[in-house]
């Protein structure tokens, strides 16, 4: 007599083993992905600029450049006095903000603050491909170089009034130049900073004119 013997066949669900995905050699890492996302707007087209906004912006730039060259600290100009005080707000904010990271950044924190805010504004307009906004933000950013240059040049003569009537011990750039042992090169450093500011301002205006011509031709 024979017996029917059933052959054992393992279920497929036990045979199938999930394997971890093998990373591709050409797959970008996290930093590369973040960088690609950050610079992605560079491939987008700029918004066109018509002649009226370009003309109005150019007139404003010309007036501001004249005032920057003749009355930077706003002794005779309400507009420049207002602009200087706006910059001063971000300057004073920068001190406690960067002091969180230690005294090394706390001293130049004022200057970093008044440069960082316009830079953030400029980058925001750049990401939106806003031509006029980017130009205005860039102008503001480089205008702060002129403001900083005045503060630098005062490191030796100590003629500028400081907030709260404080003395030379509270002068950011005198302290920094003393720490770096470059107080004797104050004029050179301040002059270079001022030159960079003017070069940046003229470059921004020239770029805006170029973008207007591109919009006009298209």
Region annotations inferred by a language model:
Residues 1-43, 218:
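Low-complexity, intrinsically disordered extramembrane tails and loops of integral membrane proteins
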Residues 6-7, 12, 30, 47, ...:
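Context-gated lysine
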Residues 30-37, 85, 89-92, 179:
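Low-complexity, intrinsically disordered, cysteine-poor segments enriched in small/polar
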Residues 37-75, 104-218:
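Metalloprotease/metallohydrolase-associated module, dominated by Zn2+-dependent proteases
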Residues 70-86:
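Interfacial/capping segments of alpha-helical transmembrane domains
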Residues 79, 83, 98, 132-135:
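Generic hydrophobic alpha-helical membrane-segment signal
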Residues 84-99, 110:
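Active-site recognition of the HExxH zinc-binding catalytic motif
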